[in-house]
Regions:
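N-terminal alpha-helical scaffold/docking segments in eukaryotic complex subunits
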Residues: 1-62
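A Lys/Arg-rich helix-loop hairpin that forms a DNA/phosphate-binding surface
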Residues: 60-70
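Eukaryote-skewed repeat-based solenoidal scaffolds used as protein-protein interaction platforms
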Residues: 68-78, 82-154
Length: 154
């Protein structure tokens, strides 16, 4: 999956391309959240968000699939948490964005139990407490978004 492919999805109002399944694309989109290339991260996150919220139609995920997405995001957030000055911040920060979308979606379409909501809140607080990579900008790379994310989670 390259930037041009992702741009074509965005330009087509986030329609799933012919001959592709949401499930197979989702796995690659999640992997792209940790990409060093900012466009690959941004377009991948935008596509996942659009498919969660159903910007132009309806959500592309069932409740069970959204829970699976959340589990992947939660695992990604923990990878390298507490380390500083490495590219793992991309995966963590974009996974926080994804988890935030999945959690916020619950307000409009309840699908989470109380335990899951509490677990996510605990993870957000752990992230705020342990994230060490607080760079606002990377040389030659788009920002890691860490400080902004911490404010949004509060």
């Amino acid at each position: 999956m390259n930037i041009e492919f992702l741009k074509s999805i965005v330009e087509n109002k986030f329609a799933v391309p012919d001959n592709y399944e949401v499930a197979e694309l989702t796995l690659k989109l999640i992997e792209n959240l940790g990409a060093v290339e900012w466009e690959l991260r941004d377009y991948s996150y935008m596509t996942l968000s659009a498919w969660i919220w159903g910007w132009y139609d309806r959500t592309n995920y069932s409740d069970a699939e959204m829970l699976e997405l959340a589990e992947k995001a939660k695992c990604n957030i923990k990878i390298g948490l507490g380390e500083a000055e490495n590219d793992g911040v991309f995966l963590r920060s974009y996974s926080i964005l994804l988890l935030s979308d999945l959690t916020d979606f619950h307000r409009y379409h309840p699908y989470l139990g109380e335990t899951e909501i509490r677990d996510r809140m605990e993870l957000y607080l752990t992230y705020i407490k342990r994230e060490q990579d607080l760079r606002g900008m990377f040389l030659q790379r788009k920002d890691g978004h860490t400080e902004l994310l911490m404010l949004l989670m509060l």
